[in-house]
Structures are given as C-alpha cells and as structure tokens.
Amino acid sequence: MYLSPQEKDKLLVVTAALLAERRLNRGLKLNHPEAVAWLSFQVLEGARDGKSVSTLMNEGTTWLTKEQVMEGVPELIHEVQIEAVFPDGTKLVTLHNPIS
C-alpha cells in the first residue's frame, strides 16, 4: 500500500487522536500535541460526515474545555488549521481559540 506524504500525516494525526480520546475517556487531561491531534481529528471526521466549514468552525470552539487539558495548554493553542476533504473538494478549516 502506497501512502502519499499527506496521507501519512493524516494517519499520524488519527493515531494520536485515538490515543488522546482514550485518555479523555479515562479522565486524563490532554497535553498540547494530544489536544491539537484530537481537535484535528474532529474536523476530519466532521468533514467526512458532510458538515460544512462554517459548522465545523463554530462547533470546534465547544469540543474541548480548559478542564480537559493540562494547565497552560489553552494559552498555547490560538488556532488549529487542518485541510479536510469535503464533498466539493479539499478546504482549510481554522479553529480560532478552540479550547473554551
């Protein structure tokens, strides 16, 4: 199986996001890389489910709270940008201040 560099990057994001989700389910707080991966994965899956860019940008600010991440993480993540495949093509989704 051949994977392009972009596909390899997305596979790494998915792997990190699944680990982050397991940790969230156990009540652990996410660190910076885990939080970014988890948010990115939510965007990728939302696009796959047919949600619009604007819907994902609005919902993206409600997915994680300060209580779910380690101290200092919200201040480190001002925005998350991820290219996602939508029914009408690939688009860049930006989540501004995604941790509330």
Swiss-Prot record:
**Is Amino-acid biosynthesis among the key words of this record?**
no
Q: Which GO terms describe its cellular component?
A: cytoplasm
Enumerate the catalysed reactions.
urea + 2 H2O + H(+) = hydrogencarbonate + 2 NH4(+)
**Which GO terms are recorded in the biological process aspect for this UniProt protein?**
urea catabolic process
Q: Which pathway does this polypeptide act in?
A: Nitrogen metabolism; urea degradation; CO(2) and NH(3) from urea (urease route): step 1/1
**What is the annotated localization of this protein?**
Cytoplasm
Q: What is its EC number?
A: 3.5.1.5
The reply to whether tRNA-binding figures as a keyword in the UniProt entry is: no
Q: Name one GO molecular function term.
A: nickel cation binding
Where primarily located? cytoplasm
Q: Which key words tag this protein in UniProt?
A: Cytoplasm, Hydrolase
Q: What class of enzyme is it?
A: hydrolase
Pfam families per the record?
Urease_gamma (PF00547)
- Give the superkingdom in one word: Bacteria
Q: Which family does it belong to?
A: Belongs to the urease gamma subunit family.
- Which NCBIfam families does the annotation name? PRK13241.1, urease_gam
Self-association or partners: how does it assemble? Heterotrimer of UreA (gamma), UreB (beta) and UreC (alpha) subunits. Three heterotrimers associate to form the active enzyme.
Task: Identify this protein by name.
Answer: Urease subunit gamma
The gene name reads ureA
